[in-house]
């Protein structure tokens, strides 16, 4: 089932945009609340309203090693403090339609969306977020800001992420030979990128290799090409996306 933007109803309360996707024939109703931070052109999505269980899953994931590493890398890449990657609107009478846990859209598209078992809802959620970002670009009007981002630029960026995601889904770890996205444990479904070459490894296998080499006093070499590396970067994709 393809995402259909004609089925979106848009409203707003205070600084929150509410997107309602209603497809009566297919019995689909999805509400997505989005906050746009104009200062750094960042979007925060309410995962509580999508499904209350997602907020609990996210809080648990954030405490695990994979979650902590991902949050650290995202904070570094975006320049946003980790504490500012999430926002909470408290539940009260005034906020009953918008309360919940809001998280950086990167976390929704690259992490949380994989926890949704319904592939149709996954597709619609991805479409809603991409549609909103493409139609709500904004550049602050300040003397120091001379760069503008067009809707076409945003679409190109989103297409690039989609292309990398599609390729990543098929990539196998060069050590265990399993498809990285198909590994049983959630924490294993990340790539460990070496700064020396482009060989593919899951984060778990390459970390074990790295630890074993250190313990035995051996140099940090790629298991395949033996090129020496200095850093391992944890990534949801098989390569870094600039």
Swiss-Prot record:
It catalyses: S-ubiquitinyl-[E2 ubiquitin-conjugating enzyme]-L-cysteine + [acceptor protein]-L-lysine = [E2 ubiquitin-conjugating enzyme]-L-cysteine + N(6)-ubiquitinyl-[acceptor protein]-L-lysine. PROSITE patterns: KILA_N (PS51301), ZF_RING_1 (PS00518), ZF_RING_2 (PS50089). Keywords: Host cytoplasm, Host-virus interaction, Metal-binding, Modulation of host cell apoptosis by virus, Modulation of host ubiquitin pathway by viral E3 ligase, Modulation of host ubiquitin pathway by virus, Transferase, Ubl conjugation pathway, Zinc, Zinc-finger. Signal peptide: none annotated. It is an enzyme of class 2 (transferase). The keyword S-adenosyl-L-methionine does not apply. Residues 21-131 form the KilA-N domain. One of its GO terms (cellular component) is host cell cytoplasm. It is found in: Host cytoplasm. A zinc finger (RING-type) spans 173-226. GO terms for molecular function: acid-amino acid ligase activity; ubiquitin protein ligase activity; zinc ion binding. GO terms for biological process: protein polyubiquitination; symbiont-mediated perturbation of host apoptosis; symbiont-mediated perturbation of host ubiquitin-like protein modification. Pfam families: KilA-N (PF04383), zf-RING_2 (PF13639). Its main location: host cell. Its EC number is 2.3.2.27. InterPro entries: E3_ubiquitin-prot_ligase_p28, KilA/APSES_HTH, KilA_N, MKRN-like, Znf_RING, Znf_RING/FYVE/PHD, Znf_RING_CS. Belongs to the orthopoxvirus OPG021 family. The RING-type zinc finger domain is required for E3 ligase activity. PANTHER family: IP09428P-RELATED (PTHR11224:SF10), MAKORIN-RELATED (PTHR11224). This is Host range factor p28. It comes from Cowpox virus (strain GRI-90 / Grishak) (CPV).
């Amino acid at each position: 089932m393809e995402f259909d933007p004609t089925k979106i109803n848009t409203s707003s309360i205070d600084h929150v945009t509410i997107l309602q996707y209603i497809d009566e024939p297919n019995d689909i109703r999805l509400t997505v609340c989005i906050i746009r931070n104009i200062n750094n052109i960042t979007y925060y999505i309410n995962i509580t309203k999508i499904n209350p269980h997602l907020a609990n899953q996210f809080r648990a994931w954030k405490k695990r090693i994979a979650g902590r590493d991902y949050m650290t890398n995202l904070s570094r890449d975006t320049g946003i403090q980790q504490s500012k990657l999430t926002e909470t609107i408290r539940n009260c009478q005034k906020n009953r339609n918008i309360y919940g846990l809001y998280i950086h859209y990167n976390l929704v598209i690259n992490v949380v969306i994989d926890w949704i078992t319904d592939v149709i809802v996954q597709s619609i959620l991805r479409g809603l977020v991409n549609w909103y970002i493409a139609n709500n670009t904004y550049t602050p009007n300040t003397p120091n800001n001379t760069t503008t981002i067009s809707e076409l630029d945003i679409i190109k960026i989103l297409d690039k992420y989609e292309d990398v995601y599609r390729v990543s889904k098929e990539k196998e770890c060069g050590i265990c030979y399993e498809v990285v996205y198909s590994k049983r444990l959630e924490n294993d479904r990340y790539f460990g990128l070496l700064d020396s070459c482009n060989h593919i490894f899951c984060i778990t296998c390459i970390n074990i290799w790295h630890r074993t080499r250190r313990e035995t006093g051996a140099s940090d070499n790629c298991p395949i090409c033996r090129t020496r590396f200095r850093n391992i970067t944890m990534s949801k994709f098989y390569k870094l996306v600039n």
